[in-house]
Design a protein with these regions (language model features):
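Polysaccharide-binding surfaces and accessory modules of carbohydrate-active proteins
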Residues: 5, 9-13, 17, 31-264, ...
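Conserved, mostly hydrophobic/aromatic
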Residues: 18, 164, 289, 335, ...
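Glycine-rich, aromatic-flanked loop segments that form ligand/cofactor-binding clefts
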Residues: 71-72, 76-117, 245-258, 300-325, ...
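Short Pro-Gly-centered flexible turn/kink motifs
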Residues: 98-105, 284-303, 728-735
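Carbohydrate-binding surface patches
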Residues: 234, 646-689
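Aromatic-lined carbohydrate-binding/catalytic grooves of carbohydrate-active enzymes
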Residues: 326-460, 476
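Glycan-recognition surfaces
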Residues: 420-459, 503-610
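C-terminal beta-sandwich/jelly-roll accessory domains of carbohydrate-active enzymes
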Residues: 672-739
Length: 739
């Protein structure tokens, strides 16, 4: 790992054992990107990679006879109005109305380690030898403003992180209309764009499209979250790249609010990728001495396919984004009462469910919505964070201790960012909701968005919920958020500051998370947003697991968890066994398949075990024991491999292999049964070719070498006409090395 500056050629080379990133200072003192990809040898002069020729209609930005044009240059941070007619990464409006800027090289610093960008979450280092950072300071003399571009390269990961910061020193105010976190350019357009798209109950479906000239993008304008529609991630892969071979570049934004990921192909087949805060309804005024910091983009390069890209994201996000008590721990097996009771419960019913959970070996009981205020339905009570003593006469403090006396840990659901109008909080502070003057106040789920851009609102909510936690014995918090923002306007905020509201809202969320996780470091936080609408890297910084989707149907979860695995580690995926018929789809799937899918996540239950048969209870007990035996491998110690995609056929398969390749667990899932089906073999991945393994599944056992299991494969059982399996059949394989 090194960051080298070659003074004569004015080139920067950032590299480790797997990746190189090269930029140079051009003759106009702006930055040009020369190369990003597989690691290449360092040399004194990389300027041979600069491409330049005279073209018709080009606007030249250097004195004659120079022919440098920004329109045909791969720029490091492109700006508006000086001959580049593609989308800029930065737009600044000055007091005279001009948007023309000229940020030129002023200085740079190379140092070991990595700085925080608080209050924004970001990846980190635990010692300075893990990474090196380059900070390049560019200066606009007319505005007297600095633009600082930061690059960090890690020793152990093919990862480059980037962010940008504006520091305004001039006497006249300026307004940021757009500032991306990173911009990267490629020589050609021979790529496919991979994105994770969807909606409620079908989050993060894998979508591919071939790049075309013009702009293709993903974005969120939801205000409160990164959204279920478009995850803040995209990748560019070569057309023939697969899970296991070929080039792919991943871009992941560590941010939970409005985002934009854009790929633009020029008429000369150059490809520009930009990612950052969505500029729509964003406007940030800076006066003298003020600054603005962008979120971080985590860029991953792989020349070994999509699965290597994913494993890199899994490792760095688990080890250098998540932090705190739970970073390196396997998760407790929980039971959540939501689908068992919804709002209809009392203390006796809750304790009966908890007792049965304890008998089955569950470790954590979670009380969901309905425990506070006058909360008996969606219409009222939200925002009143004090216990409903009619339902729970012992209070949360008493109930939590009764649950602990059963031998279980106790967890609690909250939705801190929202309010019902039928609540004491709203009646006391009607001006605390986000809404525009003299406009209809749109509602969703009968609730409204609290204005977290205001410190006094965050302060109030913090004190309310912290009081409940302090007085109780709580080991887990599920932090939900169930609606998007509408009519974005902050009452009492100056008109010139309204463009800051949505970003400041997200900063308010981060502030509350920081306060709670600081005061209660032992609590396991799980984020949630109508299921998986805020499954983004920034949330993992505060809450090391996220509710993956409200859709708990096993067959649907195959797609959701498969897509989620493109970026997010298995240990971050909230995954539960729920009742049948499923509450979202009314589909019935086998209890074994529901568990076989949920194992590849945090694992838990979302049902009333009292309603199961004695046979089913015994099956649940066996599932719990299996997960306890294998969760360190699945959640902490293993690498995840995708084998068969549910987006490409009727079958899904994946597996987790320990780093020493001594253990593995694999899941195979057949969606619909096939009559008189053809044979197929399941080929495992990630094993030691020369190691002898014992493979167990159902009542069968096989000893075979790793190369047999990976290349020849193992036949998937086919009974004649498949009469015995039925739809939604699954098989779980355990693989152990033989001495």
């Amino acid at each position: 790992m090194a960051i080298v500056f070659h003074k004569e050629s004015r080139c920067f080379h950032l590299y480790n054992d797997e990746v190189s990133y090269i930029i140079r200072i051009m003759e106009n003192e702006q930055l040009e990107q020369l190369y990003y990809g597989k690691k290449i040898h360092d040399r004194e002069d990389f300027t041979y990679l600069h491409e330049e020729c005279m073209r018709s209609q080009m606007s030249i930005c250097v004195p004659e006879p120079g022919i440098l044009s920004m329109q045909y240059t791969k720029q490091e941070f492109p700006t508006y109005g000086t001959g580049d007619y593609r989308s800029p990464a930065l737009t600044i409006v000055q007091e005279n109305g001009s948007r023309i800027v000229n940020f030129t090289y002023a200085s740079h610093e190379i140092y070991n380690g990595k700085k925080d960008i608080l209050p924004l979450p970001a990846t980190y280092v635990e010692n300075e030898d893990e990474a090196q950072t380059l900070e390049v300071t560019l200066h606009d003399a007319v505005m007297d403003t600095d633009l600082i571009l930061s690059y960090t390269i890690y020793e152990e990961y093919p990862v480059l992180t980037r962010n940008a910061k504006i520091c305004h020193k001039g006497s006249e105010k300026i307004v940021l209309d757009k500032i991306m976190s990173a911009s990267v350019e490629f020589n050609d357009m021979d790529y496919e764009m991979v994105q994770l798209s969807g909606g409620w109950a079908r989050e993060r479906y894998v979508k591919n499209r071939k790049l075309e000239m013009g702009i293709q993008s993903i974005q969120s304008l939801n205000g409160t979250c990164s959204g279920a529609e478009q995850n803040p991630f995209l990748a560019l892969k070569r057309p023939h790249t697969t899970e296991n071979q070929g080039e792919v570049y991943g871009f992941s934004l560590v941010y939970s609010g409005n985002h934009l990921g854009q790929v633009e192909v020029s008429t000369f087949d150059m490809t520009r990728v930009m990612m950052g805060i969505n500029p729509e309804d964003f406007s940030w005024e800076l006066t003298q001495g003020e600054s603005f910091q962008t979120p971080e983009v985590v860029m991953v390069y792989s020349d070994q396919g999509l699965n290597k890209m994913s494993q890199t994201y899994h490792r760095i996000y688990r080890k250098r984004l998540m932090h705190g008590t739970w970073r390196d721990q396997a998760r407790p097996i929980l039971l959540n009462n939501w689908e068992a009771t919804y709002f209809d419960f009392d203390e006796e019913k809750i304790l009966n469910i908890a007792k049965k959970a304890k008998e089955a070996g569950v470790e954590l009981f979670v009380l969901d919505d309905g425990w506070f205020g006058a909360r008996n339905d969606d219409y009222c009570g939200l925002g009143d964070w004090y216990v409903n003593l009619e339902k729970l006469p012992s209070g949360i403090s008493g109930l939590s201790r009764k649950v602990e006396e059963l031998g279980l840990k106790f967890g609690l659901w909250v939705e801190l960012e929202m309010v019902n109008k039928d609540s004491d909080l709203y009646r006391a502070h009607p001006d605390w909701i986000i809404s525009a003057p003299e406009r209809f106040e749109s509602h969703a789920r009968h609730q409204f968005v609290l204005d977290f851009s205001k410190k006094e609102v965050v302060d109030y909510i913090y004190e309310m919920v912290a009081k409940v936690i302090r007085e109780s014995s709580i080991s887990y918090i599920k932090w939900d958020m169930n609606r998007y923002m509408t009519e974005p306007y902050s009452k009492g905020t100056e008109p010139s500051q309204q463009g800051k509201v949505m970003h400041k809202y997200i900063l308010g969320v981060y502030d509350l998370y920081t306060r709670l996780t600081t005061e209660f470091p032992e609590i396991l936080f799980e984020s949630c947003a109508s299921g998986g609408a805020r499954f983004d890297p920034a949330m993992l910084y505060f809450a090391p697991q996220t509710w993956t989707s409200d859709d708990t149907d096993a067959a649907e979860r195959e797609k959701i968890q498969y897509g989620t695995s493109f970026v997010y580690p298995i240990v971050s995926m909230g995954s539960h066994v729920s009742a049948v018929p499923n509450h979202q789809l009314h589909r019935t799937t086998p209890l074994s398949t529901r568990a076989n899918v949920a194992y590849f996540g945090t694992f838990g239950y979302e049902l009333d075990l009292n309603l199961l048969s004695a046979k089913e209870i015994e099956e649940v007990k066996a599932q719990v024991e299996f997960m306890k035996e294998h969760r360190d491998l699945i959640q902490v110690e293993g690498d995840f491999y995708r084998i068969l995609s549910p987006f490409e056929g009727n079958d899904t398969a994946w597996m987790v292999v320990s780093r020493d390749k001594k253990q593995a667990v694999a899941g195979y899932y057949e969606r619909l049964n096939k009559v008189n089906a053809s044979w197929m073999r399941l080929r495992f991945k990630g094993l030691d070719e020369d190691q002898l393994y014992k493979v167990k599944w159902e009542d069968k056992c096989l000893k075979a070498y790793g190369n047999e299991l990976m290349y020849a494969g193992i036949p998937v059982d086919r009974d004649y006409c498949n009469k015995t399996n039925g739809d939604f059949h699954s098989v779980l394989y355990t693989i152990e090395a033989e001495d």
